[in-house]
């Protein structure tokens, strides 16, 4: 195709919030205008270069790589320069220069390169001096023509005929002001002009939307004065438009083509590139064979001892395992992946030597005997029936991918080891790009266009939420009628007004949705290269880290030839580590390496559904599944972990029924019984699909993996081809065509959501480990869980409730006992006794584990108090003894460590109750206490420190005050800790709730039948969330009662409207609700609400009382007299039975004519007189 003009100045959304175009859109525009090439020139970065090149090549266009950088010519002189890669050397210099802007020079003013950087890396580059934003243009705008010419000569001296003057015509005054002098200098120095047009949006009509984008970037509204704007002409113009625009400078148009013809490099994909792990003495292949064989011998030695395998059976086991090892090694080495395995093995072995807990495996890698032998995984693949071909398929070459779980607290240590081993310039994180997704873009655009908040908030709530597959705004408008109505300009159903503005917000949001908003880093991905990263990919550094970050997203990172290693931080491993540390303080050593998975206590606990804190088994539905399943082996835990997902969940009842012999398993065919027996005929695992194809239809395991993939993808053509192969193979195995087709269809259905058994098994092991710790060492386990959730008061509530359910006492926060973190208080002396894992029960000599341990509440779990403050308090106590009073506390801690909110929450949480029994008085004295702190320490620091003066300062710090009642103190605690510790506000209502048949949260689980139940339940509202679903808005409430916390939903707008006054946090309510109880757990839907006062004050009771003497009679009459209230809501009737002291039978009965308004605590007091 003959091209007359090429765009050399296009920016994509990788120029964050500056361009409204994606790389793909830029290529599409160039293609639609019949251009032969297109140049991408993002600001400061090359993040989109490979993506852009691949799109362009796919469309038959020549990609040209450029970048716009800030350059410092001399002190204080900064300007823009446009650099274009002529060849591979030029592209590598582009990578280096763009990376320099992020990694080396002082970035306080702006990201930039220096003139010296440019000279050093000029080879292979074509340079355009930017027009008004370049150094020449800036000098001319400042009337410094001589200086402009000097800079032009300097650049020409470096680049020669690779230096151009960019010229633009966007109809801007500054462009017109300098054009004549600019052209004159170019002509004088014989520097060619090249015509460009800033391309920031596709067409002129997009200018308004782009203007909104600039406002989002600046954080201002459209009405903001003196904000940055761009010309409406910054759109993708056709060649015809550009030729007409520069009709008087035809050479400037021609030079766009001439310049392009000088460029002959495009970013491309590369084969995988890894560091060489070989040494001068041994190759990678020989090294992996040696280390794997030595490792397998060690693994088998441990296996033989822990499983008590007799010597006569050991040899046959060795033969089986080494045959599998050799098979795997041959495949690994033939694929040239030996180095990959050795690299992973090296950093995992280092981690374990440092005492850093590493997960037993994750993903399909746990199916490799080589990985097990090299200590990469800790799961015996043959014992668990795992397949190597699921991880590395000899019939389909692809990179292996080990995802490694580390203790979250120490993950950084492992990464730093890798950096030190391979070099900081060869190890990097992976960039991620945050996009303007539907909800976020509506909020951003609404803010810029000044749409009132209530409209913007309602619009965003209408967009359905999906974390896995985010719903686009276009989808939402199609699926949500109210959004569709608003997009047509008809406004919102529930809010009047702003019709046109709402439509404009949605129209603009549709244009901007999907653009990149910012960059971040991948949570786990690390790349390790065999050369400096900047030789292959763009790199940058986050301002908060000294570690390089690869500027390609994960997809393009791998296409560029970089190998990703996932260093994942798993909180559960931190829980296990911390729990083991706490036990070690009691001289109890736990070693899970030789665990036999048969601890009776563990399975007894799981059978009761006690899954809180147990990895994978924490949800309500999962706990219910545990109760029904009654697991008694590790295989049950593995299966349940794999089954409890959308789709496979429907097979849980079949699995349970067959396990308990209530139903006969269906093995599909007698040949399949050995494969499906473990899962009672249910096809759960992908590995089972592979085995079925192998046994029934003669597939190799590699070919069976291709079958599994085809079934998972459900691509019709592939499925038909595979069915033909399967049926043909089955017929050869004496199976009828009809049965073969039936089995294929059944297996295909299961395979669509089959789970990777290697991953399920590895995570099942972690589940067992956490369950074992919880069942055998509950206090230490709960403390380890709590210390990971110091800022999550919902989780703290949950774990403390779990502790109470296990009869573990909770010691309220106490300034003389508590530390920064939760801790265990044990009263049994600690003995020296080491023990291994779940063999503890079989050991004659056992350490004394304190079953009466208590948990001490953490200061760091109080709002506004950090663990560091807790450490300060602990250090002071250890150095100088316990605090004697609040004044002593104030005097011993530095004033800068204590602020008003911190002191308030310490008081409200009851931390000083041991020192002072009136919290309200301390609370009212906070300002005086803080003032005294400053005065005391100032006096102490002065040369005139006087005990007498200090004594006078400390007098009358505390103001006079009455004592707060129990409920006030309870809500103090809730405000400070998000929970009730010493007393729950509903405790006093227990008796009246029983009378009114108002259920407790415990009753919901224990005393309700399956199905739908209409009940009343009471609670204190602790949290309120408003959400949107496809059906509309709904509200979830988290409530608590003295037994537990629970959640309910409100779906009815009418209920929300009628009871809005009762739905504030801290409200005490009685809820009339529908409870659906089934195998998935309990779901509560509110139908109506009452305040506690109304719910308990309008019921009639016949209160029968039996005083034993005159004194008790007097007390009853005094209390009832104070509660006489004959209004309609006070219907409690009291009857007193008087007894003769010498006769057991009652001789008189008095019924009061009055009605009483009794409170919950009154029932509590009167209950002592209700026994005859």
Curated annotation (Swiss-Prot):
Gene3D superfamilies: 1.10.150.870, Bacterial DNA polymerase III alpha subunit, thumb domain (1.10.10.1600), Metal-dependent hydrolases (3.20.20.140). Its EC number is 2.7.7.7. The keyword Protein biosynthesis does not apply. Pfam families: DNA_pol3_alpha (PF07733), DNA_pol3_finger (PF17657), HHH_6 (PF14579), PHP (PF02811). Belongs to the DNA polymerase type-C family. DnaE subfamily. DNA polymerase III is a complex, multichain enzyme responsible for most of the replicative synthesis in bacteria. This DNA polymerase also exhibits 3' to 5' exonuclease activity. The alpha chain is the DNA polymerase. This is DNA polymerase III subunit alpha. The lineage of its organism: Bacteria, Pseudomonadati, Pseudomonadota, Alphaproteobacteria, Rickettsiales.
């Amino acid at each position: 195709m003959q091209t007359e003009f090429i765009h050399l100045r296009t920016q994509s959304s990788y120029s964050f919030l500056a361009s409204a175009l994606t790389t793909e859109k830029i290529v599409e525009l160039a293609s639609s205008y019949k251009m032969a090439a297109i140049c991408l020139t993002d600001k400061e970065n090359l993040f989109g270069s490979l993506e852009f090149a691949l799109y362009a090549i796919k469309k038959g266009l020549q990609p040209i790589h450029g970048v716009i950088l800030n350059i410092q010519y001399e002190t204080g002189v900064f300007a823009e320069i446009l650099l274009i890669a002529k060849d591979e050397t030029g592209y590598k210099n582009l990578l280096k220069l763009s990376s320099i802007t992020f990694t080396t020079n002082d970035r306080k003013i702006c990201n930039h390169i220096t003139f010296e950087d440019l000279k050093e890396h000029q080879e292979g580059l074509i340079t355009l001096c930017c027009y008004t934003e370049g150094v020449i243009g800036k000098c001319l705008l400042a009337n410094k023509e001589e200086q402009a010419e000097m800079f032009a000569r300097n650049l020409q001296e470096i680049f020669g005929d690779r230096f151009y003057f960019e010229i633009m015509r966007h109809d801007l005054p500054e462009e017109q002001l300098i054009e004549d002098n600019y052209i004159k200098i170019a002509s004088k120095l014989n520097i060619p002009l090249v015509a460009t047009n800033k391309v920031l949006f596709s067409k002129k009509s997009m200018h308004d939307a782009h203007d909104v984008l600039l406002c989002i970037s600046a954080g201002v509204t459209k009405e903001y004065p003196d904000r940055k704007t761009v010309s409406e002409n910054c759109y993708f113009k056709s060649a015809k438009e550009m030729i007409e625009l520069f009709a008087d400078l035809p050479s400037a148009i021609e030079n766009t083509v001439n310049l392009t013809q000088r460029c002959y490099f495009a970013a491309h994909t590369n084969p995988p590139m890894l560091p060489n792990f070989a040494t001068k003495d041994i190759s990678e292949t020989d090294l992996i064979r040696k280390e794997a064989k030595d490792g397998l011998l060690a693994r088998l030695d441990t296996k033989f001892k822990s499983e008590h395998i007799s010597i006569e059976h050991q040899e046959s086991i060795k033969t089986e395992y080494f045959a599998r090892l050799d098979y795997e090694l041959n495949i690994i080495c033939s694929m040239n992946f030996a180095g990959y395995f050795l690299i992973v093995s090296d950093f995992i072995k280092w981690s374990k030597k440092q005492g850093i807990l590493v997960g037993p495996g994750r993903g399909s890698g746990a199916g490799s005997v080589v990985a097990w032998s090299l200590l990469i995984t800790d799961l015996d693949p043959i014992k668990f029936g795992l397949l190597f071909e699921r991880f590395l398929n000899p019939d389909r070459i692809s990179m292996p991918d080990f995802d490694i779980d580390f203790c979250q607290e120490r993950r950084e240590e492992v990464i730093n080891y890798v950096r030190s081993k391979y070099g900081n310039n060869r190890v990097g994180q992976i960039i991620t790009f945050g996009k303007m997704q539907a909800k976020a873009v509506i909020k951003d655009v609404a803010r810029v266009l000044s749409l009132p908040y209530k409209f913007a908030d309602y619009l965003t709530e209408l967009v359905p939420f999906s974390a896995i597959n985010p719903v686009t705004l276009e989808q939402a408008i199609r699926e949500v009628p109210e959004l569709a109505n608003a997009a047509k300009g008809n406004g919102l159903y529930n809010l009047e007004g702003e019709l046109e503005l709402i439509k404009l917000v949605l129209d603009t949001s549709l244009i901007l949705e999907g653009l990149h908003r910012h960059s971040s880093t991948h949570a786990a991905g690390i790349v390790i290269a065999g050369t400096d990263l900047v030789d292959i990919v763009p790199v940058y550094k986050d301002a908060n880290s000294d570690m390089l970050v690869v500027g390609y997203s994960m997809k393009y990172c791998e296409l560029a030839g970089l190998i990703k290693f996932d260093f994942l931080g798993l909180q559960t491993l931190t829980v296990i580590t911390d729990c083991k540390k706490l036990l070690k303080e009691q001289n109890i050593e736990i070693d899970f390496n030789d665990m036999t998975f048969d601890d009776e206590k563990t399975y007894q606990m799981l059978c009761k559904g006690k899954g809180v804190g147990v990895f994978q088994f924490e949800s309500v539905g999962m706990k219910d599944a545990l109760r029904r399943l009654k697991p008694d082996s590790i295989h049950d835990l593995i299966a349940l972990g794999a089954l409890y997902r959308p789709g496979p969940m429907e097979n849980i009842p079949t699995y349970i029924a067959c396990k308990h012999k209530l139903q006969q398993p269906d093995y599909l065919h007698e040949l399949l019984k050995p494969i499906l027996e473990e899962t009672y005929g249910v096809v759960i695992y992908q590995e089972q699909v592979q085995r079925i194809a192998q046994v029934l239809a003669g597939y190799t395991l590699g070919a069976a993996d291709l079958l599994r993939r085809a079934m998972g993808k459900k691509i019709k053509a592939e499925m038909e081809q595979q069915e033909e192969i399967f049926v043909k193979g089955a017929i050869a195995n004496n199976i009828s065509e009809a049965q073969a087709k039936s089995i294929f269809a059944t297996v295909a259905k299961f395979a669509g959501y089959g789970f990777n058994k290697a991953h399920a098994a590895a995570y099942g092991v972690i589940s067992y480990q956490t369950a074992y710790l919880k069942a055998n060492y509950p206090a230490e386990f709960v403390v380890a869980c709590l210390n990971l959730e110091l800022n999550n008061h919902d989780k703290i509530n949950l774990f403390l409730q779990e502790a109470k359910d296990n009869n573990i006492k909770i010691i309220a926060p106490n300034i003389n006992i508590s530390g920064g973190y939760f801790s265990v208080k044990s009263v049994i002396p600690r003995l020296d006794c080491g023990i291994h894992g779940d063999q503890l029960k079989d050991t004659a000599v056992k350490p004394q584990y304190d079953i009466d341990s208590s948990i001490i509440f953490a200061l760091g779990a109080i709002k506004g108090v950090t663990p560091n403050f807790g450490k300060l308090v602990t250090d002071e106590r250890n150095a100088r003894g316990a605090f004697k009073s609040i004044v002593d506390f104030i005097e011993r801690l530095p004033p800068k460590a204590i602020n008003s909110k911190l002191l308030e929450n310490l008081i409200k949480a009851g931390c000083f109750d041991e020192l002072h029994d009136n919290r309200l008085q301390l609370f009212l004295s906070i300002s005086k206490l803080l003032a005294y702190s400053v005065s005391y320490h100032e006096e102490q620091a002065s040369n005139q420190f006087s005990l007498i003066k200090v004594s006078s300062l400390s007098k009358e710090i505390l103001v006079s005050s009455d004592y707060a009642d129990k409920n006030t103190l309870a809500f103090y605690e809730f405000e400070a800790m998000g929970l009730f510790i010493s007393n729950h506000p509903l405790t006093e209502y227990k008796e009246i709730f029983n009378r009114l048949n108002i259920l407790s949260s415990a009753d919901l689980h224990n005393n309700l039948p399956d199905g739908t139940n209409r009940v009343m339940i009471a609670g204190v509202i602790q949290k309120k969330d408003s959400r949107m679903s496809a059906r509309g808005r709904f509200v979830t409430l988290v409530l608590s009662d003295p037994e537990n916390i629970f959640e309910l939903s409100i779906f009815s707008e009418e209920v929300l409207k009628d009871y809005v006054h009762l739905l504030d946090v801290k409200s005490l309510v009685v809820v009339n609700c529908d409870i659906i109880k089934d195998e998935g757990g309990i779901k509560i839907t509110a139908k109506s609400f009452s305040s506690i006062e109304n719910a308990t004050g309008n019921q009639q009771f016949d209160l029968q009382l039996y005083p034993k003497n005159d004194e008790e009679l007097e007390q009853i009459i005094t209390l009832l007299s104070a509660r006489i209230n004959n209004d309609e809501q006070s219907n409690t009737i009291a009857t007193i039975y008087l007894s003769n002291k010498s006769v057991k039978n009652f001789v008189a009965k008095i019924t009061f004519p009055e009605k009483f308004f009794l409170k919950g605590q009154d029932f509590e007091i009167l209950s002592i007189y209700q026994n005859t």
